[in-house]
């Protein structure tokens, strides 16, 4: 008998740092101009679930699309490298033409 647990906890993504770099690179290639940390997090979690890169994926269905704090730090470190290499910059303020989430950070891809 299989038992499925439902969880609203942050999703424990199990990408290595190198795998996470690839996932973020793939996402940035699809971005036309700007993105939010929230949108990137959604993409990473959705992809991790599809690829089986989530702890307890076989027995847990997550209703959250937030990453764990440790995964968020890895993503932040990778984004910092993109900023340092002038491939992405932080966009301060709000954009009325995009979805805005409280305490979210927007980024612009340098083309």
Sequence positions of predicted segments:
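Long, low-complexity, charged/polar intrinsically disordered regions in eukaryotic proteins
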Residues: 1-37
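Charge-rich, solvent-exposed alpha-helical interaction surfaces
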Residues: 19, 23-27, 43, 47, ...
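Surface-exposed polar/charged interaction patches
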Residues: 26, 30, 34, 47-51, ...
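Short amphipathic alpha-helical interaction segments
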Residues: 67-85
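A short, conserved structural fragment
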Residues: 83-93
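Short, cationic-aromatic polyanion-contact patches
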Residues: 93-111
